[in-house]
């Protein structure tokens, strides 16, 4: 054991002193080659196929990849097609265009003023001011809290307006209005000004603001399905066809212009579209089955249509063509699942990316033990509910990693990289420390967790002696004697 390693353990009392890297890829333990290729793939926008057992860092590499590709620069919208509503258009807006639109929309919001700063007649007609006593209150209060008179302006509804106001107030009906239009002098000409109710304030819209609003209203109605401010990392593990490829929601009114919802408003983007300009991560990709074909099509064309997936739905007749789907695919699988990956899909990955075999162990060196300490600190910080670990306890975690490398991978003088299970062991030790009220996870906590954190098969063998004995203890005599019991079956049972 090297002297620097010993000095390090003597210098720092616990893992709270371990520095965690800011670079997400540097937090991946023991997968140096995979990290190097992933950093290149992020810069060059290459696909990745990560092959290896669970818990060796495939998900961490995929998530870290999204930090290197930059923020998206395009927003995807579907626009209403008046001539053929079932075929909405696709509209792509750059970040600059989206920001400009937001500025225009904010400029149409007008100016908010206090009701007391508005003209008296406006405040009364909008329901803020009592026309009798001049008291100001919320427009939702129909009766003045000061004089108990109806607040709506008397005379605004004809000669019987005061009668209607009293009756309306008695039955909880508001007689004031939401908007008042006036003219005011602006230099050498008159301009129209609109006053609107806005909670406890009044919104003032001048002529320029109204003109901007009219320009915005002339634009074709649209719906944003992939916003500009989105997470570039999209997880699609175990996704259904609808989640992966998008859909069009059902409308019980069949998209009727007056009663129903227009088709463009019912379009839903899939994961392949949400990952546009980002990373689409699919763990256990072979579980997608035939859906791999659609992933391949999206990778080839960099666009994929959205259509209704349910033939019985009103959305089945709606289709949006050429929806952008330009993503980096990071797929992951176990070694024994490789034959079940669609051959053209794998060829596409190899043709524009890399296949990486993840390591399961690393050399038991001083540097790698330091990486184990970093891993322990990362797991504790990530959990957020357990204390840090003493160095004596951390030595036991390292020793456990050494044992697992020998037991599972049959490697001597190596440390396991199947770190997910070790992370569970660290959390179990942390829970024990919390239960005891310890400020740090000590050696005894880890030893207790190691005894507790064993596979259930081991516990069954220790308790019952064999799996058959354990099964037998859970079945009745009639179940054991049944010819349909799997223990009583042989090959002739199927003839």
Curated annotation (Swiss-Prot):
Binding site for ATP: 52-59
Residue stretches of biased makeup (Polar residues): 472-486
Stated family: Belongs to the peptidase S16 family.
Alphabetized Gene3D superfamilies for the sequence: 1.10.8.60, P-loop containing nucleotide triphosphate hydrolases
Keyword flag Nucleotide-binding: yes
TM ranges: none
GO biological process: proteolysis; regulation of DNA-templated transcription
Known EC number: 3.4.21.-
Source organism of this protein record: Thermoplasma volcanium (strain ATCC 51530 / DSM 4299 / JCM 9571 / NBRC 15438 / GSS1)
Enzyme class, spelled out: hydrolase
Name of protein: Putative lon protease homolog
Gene Ontology molecular-function annotations: ATP binding; ATP hydrolysis activity; serine-type peptidase activity
Keyword Cell membrane listed: no
Region Disordered, annotated ranges: 471-495
Keywords: ATP-binding, Hydrolase, Nucleotide-binding, Protease, Serine protease
InterPro entries: AAA+_ATPase, CbbQ/NirQ/NorQ/GpvN, Mg_chelatse_chII-like_cat_dom, P-loop_NTPase, Sigma_54_int
């Amino acid at each position: 054991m090297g002297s620097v390693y010993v000095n390090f353990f003597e210098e720092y009392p616990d893992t709270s002193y371990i520095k965690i890297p800011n670079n997400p890829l540097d937090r991946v333990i023991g997968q140096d080659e995979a990290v190097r290729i992933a950093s290149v793939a992020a810069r060059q926008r290459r696909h990745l196929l990560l092959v290896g057992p669970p818990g060796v860092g495939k998900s961490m590499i995929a998530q870290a990849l999204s930090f290197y590709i930059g923020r998206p620069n395009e927003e995807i919208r579907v626009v209403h097609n008046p001539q053929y509503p079932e075929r909405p258009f696709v509209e792509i807006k750059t970040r600059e265009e989206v920001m400009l639109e937001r500025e225009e929309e904010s400029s149409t919001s007008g100016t908010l003023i206090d009701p007391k700063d508005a003209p008296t007649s406006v405040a009364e007609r909008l329901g803020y001011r009592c026309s009798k006593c001049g008291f100001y209150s919320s427009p939702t209060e129909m009766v003045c809290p000061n004089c108990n008179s109806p607040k709506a302006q008397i005379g605004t509804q004809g000669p019987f307006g005061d009668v209607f106001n009293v009756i309306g107030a008695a039955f909880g009906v508001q007689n004031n209005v939401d908007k008042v239009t006036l003219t005011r002098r602006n230099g050498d000409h008159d301009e129209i000004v609109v006053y609107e109710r806005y909670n406890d304030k009044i919104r003032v819209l001048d002529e320029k603001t109204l003109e901007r609003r009219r320009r915005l209203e002339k634009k074709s109605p649209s719906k944003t399905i992939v916003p500009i401010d989105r997470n570039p990392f999209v997880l699609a593990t175990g996704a259904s066809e609808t989640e992966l490829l998008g859909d069009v929601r059902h409308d019980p009114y069949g998209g009727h212009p007056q009663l129903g919802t227009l088709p463009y408003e019912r379009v839903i983007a899939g994961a392949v579209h949400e990952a546009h300009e980002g990373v689409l991560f699919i763990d256990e990709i072979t579980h997608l089955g035939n859906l791999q074909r659609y992933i391949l099509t999206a990778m080839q064309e960099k666009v994929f249509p959205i259509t209704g997936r349910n033939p019985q739905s009103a959305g089945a007749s709606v289709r949006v063509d050429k929806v952008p789907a330009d993503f980096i695919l990071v797929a992951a699988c176990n070694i024994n699942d490789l034959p079940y990956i669609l051959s053209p899909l794998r060829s596409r990955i190899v043709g524009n990316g890399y296949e990486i075999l993840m390591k399961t162990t690393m050399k038991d060196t001083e540097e790698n033990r330091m990486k184990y300490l970093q891993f322990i600190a990362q797991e504790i910080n990530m959990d957020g509910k357990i204390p840090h670990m003493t160095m004596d306890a951390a030595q036991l975690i390292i020793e456990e990693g050494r044992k697992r490398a020998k037991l599972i991978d049959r490697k001597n003088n190596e440390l396991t990289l199947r770190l997910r299970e070790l992370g569970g062991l660290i959390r179990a030790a942390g829970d024990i420390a919390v239960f005891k009220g310890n400020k740090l996870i000590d050696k005894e906590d880890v030893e207790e967790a190691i005894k507790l954190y064993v596979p259930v098969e081991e516990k069954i063998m220790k308790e019952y002696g064999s799996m058959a004995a354990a099964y037998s203890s859970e079945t009745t005599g009639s179940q054991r004697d049944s010819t349909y019991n799997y223990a009583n079956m042989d090959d002739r049972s199927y003839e």
